[in-house]
């Protein structure tokens, strides 16, 4: 057979012609596949115990439905909901949805009614993002603690004012980064990291696609001056995880970039962003976007990868496109095995811990300085981000 015909023959028969030459062991390994240990994480022994502490709290601002899970978390921890105030008359649905979830709670006449009520110890809030820090400052200056939806602060100037007020009042300015604090797989990952399951954490990688669902979005959603920009907004969830899992107390931004790829009719909007960060506890990479396709079935395929010196963890938080049902999937590889852990039974500790913090003047549920460090990082990344332009 001449060389040209030989080449044509080999191309025609393809890789199948090489199969007889492969050792039997190769087929045995491929057939056996990886041996994955399947586990189901157990709830805390006291998961159904009555809350240890109780407080009275109110809600101000209903412009993001995160306020429903924020309120529920405080109630789980022993919070008694006293009153609610809708700060946006253009959003009557916010109040209707809140009352449908929490019943016929008293509707306050105005902000002062809540701030001047000495029985109220905490205000939880989800107004339009640019209003959150000014509201939190007023709350703290009235002797109450504050729990904001993310982003809790959208400018470096607001951050400086918040830090100043915390120092002067001794009150707590908490931000509910729900993608860690209210995700069971993320809670389990924290326990594993703390126990040394993967050695020292080297890097976190967060991939956080979201679904834009444009018809449901209010005008402020498209304006970075109101919501802070994509890195400040949905990036804050992710950088909170970098700070927490690496244990960083000092950190900075190495690089950041943003783009508006798909929404020319909303020229100020940002639908893509990413950033690299580094701290005294490790490194981190974050990618955020508004490109979740309808076919996924949930709002986003959120992933977290935690690299350690002795193993790594992957979280598939809300969906597993490999076929496992539901969310809260954790995969861990260490020196001994490959493990899959179903985390749906894990107890969410934030509510009880946070109510305890309000009573005891502690920071168990969320470290105050870490929350502000995560915020500072995304604000710097947002401010200094390179604006990308792609060929249309």
Predicted features and spans:
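N-terminal secretory signal peptides and thylakoid transit peptides that target proteins
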Residues: 1-17
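C-terminal helix-rich "cap/oligomerization" subdomain common to oxidoreductases
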Residues: 12-22, 27-51, 122-124, 353-392
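N-terminal Rossmann-like dinucleotide-binding module
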Residues: 28-101
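Contiguous beta-strand/loop segments that form the cofactor/metal-binding neighborhood of enzyme cores
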Residues: 36-47, 240-320, 350-361
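Mid-domain beta-loop-alpha active-site segment that forms a flexible
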Residues: 69, 176-184, 216-252, 269-271, ...
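Beta-loop-alpha module in the N-terminal Rossmann-like domain of NAD(P)-dependent dehydrogenases
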Residues: 91, 105-165
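A contiguous active-site-proximal alpha/beta segment in oxidoreductase catalytic domains
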Residues: 153-215
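NAD(P)-dependent dehydrogenases' Rossmann-like dinucleotide-binding region
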Residues: 176-179, 195-216, 230, 234-238, ...
